[in-house]
Amino acid sequence: MAGSLKKLAKAESCRLMQEKLESWSKDYEINSCDQNLNQCCELIEMTSVIQGQLFTILNETSRESGHYAGVDTIKTRLLPWLGTWFSHATSGRLFETGLFLNQDSTETERKLRQLATSQTLQLQDLQEELTSTRLELNHVQQDLAQTQLALEDTKTQLATTLLTAADEIIQLRAVLKASRAQEEDSLRRLDHLNDCEQQIERLRDELSILDAQKSVLQSRIARSRSPSPRRIRSRSPSPLPLRSCSPGRARSTNASRHAFLVARFGDIYSKDRFDAERILRTYISDMEMVQRIIYTAAVESFHAAKMAYRQFKMRVRKTLSIGHSGPESLEDTVMDYIVRHEDLYDVQASVNEVIRSMNINPKISSTPECDFAVISSFIRELCRVAFSMQTLTPPLDVAFGMDGEFFSETKYHRSVDSDYTAALVAYHVWPALMENDVVIVKGEAVTKRGALWSHRSRSRSQNRSRSVSPLLSHLSRSR
């Protein structure tokens, strides 16, 4: 008996059965019905093996004790348990298990029949859907074939249209080229006509002057041939046809022209200057450089207008001095003529001279995309005003300004971005208008600390690039 017991203990059947019970308990919810039944049957088999070994040990133990040894224990413990288990197993649980299995098999067969029916229906639906899909696919293939044919036709039409458009573009380019050539020819003719008209006007003025000279000469010849002084006095010449107004017109209108020109100079500063700045700012981002360009344009415009006025005055004096006679002096006659014929001033030549001077000025620079001609209308208006100011008595001129000079409260206003504690001018924004060294309209300047040193460094670089300093250049211009 002891050997059988030791063998059972070493077999560890109970421990293995416990592990299988725990594993089954964990996997019960995820296992299928067949897997759970297999697990249960396996445990029953293990239990029956262990029970068989225990009954063997029970028989051997009772045999070793004698025929009647352990009878009481078997009666009180084993027989009641066996009776209870067999009664329950045979009467209740086996019946319930059989009934449950019958019901389960019936339900399973019913579900299988339903599943087979549903699968048959699904298969029929799938076949019908497949048939309809095939029909739709055939329609789509037919539509695709028609679309491809239409696409080929469209490509052919598009190629034809492109060829036609290319021919039209070539023809239009030829027409455009011819139109541009015709336009350029028309512009050249128009310029030639303008030049001819200007020449005609000049010739008319010269003819009027020559007529005046002719009348003067004829009167002199008549006086020289007259025998008596009394007849000479009676044949005094008529007024020159050159003057269509009263004598001394320039002197009589000097005050009104002075007020008008000063007001126009202020309008250029307050309106036209900002228009020119807006044009330059589209090409130049540096505001200081833009203001320097505007100031240089104003100064150069006055210089070019003064030079043109001197040349124009010399020509008029030379022409009128030949046959001048009358109560007025030659200077008054010349001034009257210039005031009446300011339209003969060749302002475009002065504009070209200003732009040429600005291009060689080392203090200002421009971008490759920008030319100073973009503000030619601003320069033209300045030249006209400056030329008219030279006909005043006394004439008006702009003040000379230089970077690094001491700021003058009587001559300039400070710009809004100035350092109001600085005493030196960094650069000028607008020139002051002078009359006999007296300021009548203030200019505008920017004051900053350290302007003298920056001016000296710029002056050294300018001296290396130019043979004449700006001061000497200004003095030579004023002469």
From Swiss-Prot:
Entry GO terms, CC: cytoplasm; cytosol; intracellular membrane-bounded organelle; mitochondrial matrix; mitochondrial outer membrane; mitochondrion
Disulfide bonds: none
Region feature (Disordered): 220-251, 456-479
Chief location bin: cytoplasm
GO process terms (BP): mitochondrial protein catabolic process; mitophagy by internal vacuole formation
Compositional bias ranges of the Low complexity kind: 235-249
Listed GO MF terms: cardiolipin binding
Keyword Mitochondrion: yes
Coiled coil feature spans: 109-161, 187-223
Protein location: Cytoplasm, Cytosol; Mitochondrion outer membrane; Mitochondrion matrix
The entry's keywords: Coiled coil, Cytoplasm, Lipid-binding, Membrane, Mitochondrion, Mitochondrion outer membrane
InterPro entries found in the cross-reference section: MIEAP, MIEAP_C
Organism superkingdom: Eukaryota
Similarity comment: family membership: Belongs to the MIEAP family.
Main function: Key regulator of mitochondrial quality that mediates the repairing or degradation of unhealthy mitochondria in response to mitochondrial damage. Mediator of mitochondrial protein catabolic process (also named MALM) by mediating the degradation of damaged proteins inside mitochondria by promoting the accumulation in the mitochondrial matrix of hydrolases that are characteristic of the lysosomal lumen.
Entries under PANTHER family matching the protein: MITOCHONDRIA-EATING PROTEIN, MITOCHONDRIA-EATING PROTEIN-RELATED
Record protein name field: Mitochondria-eating protein
Organism expressing this protein natively: Gallus gallus
